[in-house]
């Protein structure tokens, strides 16, 4: 399954994995998963977190390692994101609910995830997705960015 991913995708997933793996020990615990989800405005219960980890945790050790994470991500990519999941992700970034993701909103979410980006890096990310050149990312541009990855 994971062998159908490009090197670039694997590198991106490794970076995402390291955002979750707060202590850098190579595995994601329910606590680490909860921290990231709460930083994104979600409020999962301990039981929900345990359920998510159990779903991915193939070897049954109670944590998610990188190969397990890769398998889950490649599956998720196969079941291309449902419209509702994409809308939900957009809402996480669109803090003020105006239908656009600004550089400030993108920086805010990335900082909460532990990614310290320079203004230039944030601007580059916005420019890469901003096809109509208005300086912010609307829903259609957001979808296009996700689908073209």
From Swiss-Prot:
Ca(2+) 1 binds at residues 21, 23, 25, 27, 32. Ca(2+) 2 binds at residues 57, 59, 61, 63, 68. The keyword Repeat applies. Pfam families: EF-hand_7. InterPro entries: CALM/Myosin/TropC-like, EF-hand-dom_pair, EF_Hand_1_Ca_BS, EF_hand_dom. Ca(2+) 4 binds at residues 130, 132, 134, 136, 141. One of its GO terms (molecular function) is calcium ion binding. Residues 8-43, 44-79, 81-116, 117-149 form the EF-hand domain. SMART domains: EFh. Keywords: Calcium, Metal-binding, Repeat. It comes from the Eukaryota. One of its GO terms (cellular component) is distal axon. Ca(2+) 3 binds at residues 94, 96, 98, 105. GO terms for biological process: establishment of localization in cell. Interacts with MYO10, the interaction is calcium-dependent and essential for MYO10 function in filopodial extension. Binds four calcium ions. May function as a specific light chain of unconventional myosin-10 (MYO10), also enhances MYO10 translation, possibly by acting as a chaperone for the emerging MYO10 heavy chain protein. May compete with calmodulin by binding, with different affinities, to cellular substrates. Belongs to the calmodulin family. This is Calmodulin-like protein 3. It comes from Mus musculus (Mouse). The gene is Calml3.
